[in-house]
Amino acid sequence: ELLSPGGSMKDRAVLSILRGAMSRGALAPGGHVLDATAGGLGISLAALCAAMGLRCTLVMPDSVSPLWKKRLEAYGAKIVLTPAAQGSAGCQEALARLRREDPAAFVPDIFSNDDAPQAHREGTGPELLRQVGNIDYLVAGVGSGSSLTGCAESIRMQCPDCRIIAVEPFASPVLSGGFPGSHPLAGIGPGFIPDNLNLYILDEVIRVKTPDSLALMRELAEKDGLLCGPSSGAALAAAILVAQRPEAEGKTVVTLLPDSGERYLD
């Protein structure tokens, strides 16, 4: 997905969310989009708002790198910084204040907005089926839960026996019943179970260790020429574990590499 205009799979979800909001009248032409994010979601929001003639304001901690801030501003986004010591609570407080100041502004909420998985039900899942054919295993990381849910629901319609496997960090095994923890695998393991994740479609959860994920991320670049992010390394680590199982011999294992690694070089 690094070939998406914003460099990540989040482009699909953001485009679907913005189009859905505009079609329902929740977001007017030339309207204002607000969100709190210091990750790849911000790039997708900034880029797509620019392309759709929308104003974009993003809240993030002041610990964000100057280059990251410049990237977002290059798309015309307005950046509101909060003290890093206040953590996510400080960002959410600032976001709430901005919403009070502009009640007509639209907040995407990628973790619970059903337009996000719909992008993958209608797009990514059918694309995989066209390109791959029968799929025996779908292995994907869980951030907002949108890509795994949407792809899985779409693929299961054509491949009812496909096993759906979620990937999460070993250090934050919330889907496995553990406790949230800090980790460097940006894009997965948010520390909670998102509303957009369809738990009922999951057959299994695989926990991946940080060193294994980062090693495969580097291997993708050095041996395959694919400069992907850490969540891609995590997904690939889990997919390899699945492919090595005796029962997977001769089967088709599909995984998703969500974003470009360039943004993590700062």
Regions found by a protein language model. Give the residues of each.
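PLP-dependent amino-acid enzyme catalytic core
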Residues: E1-D266
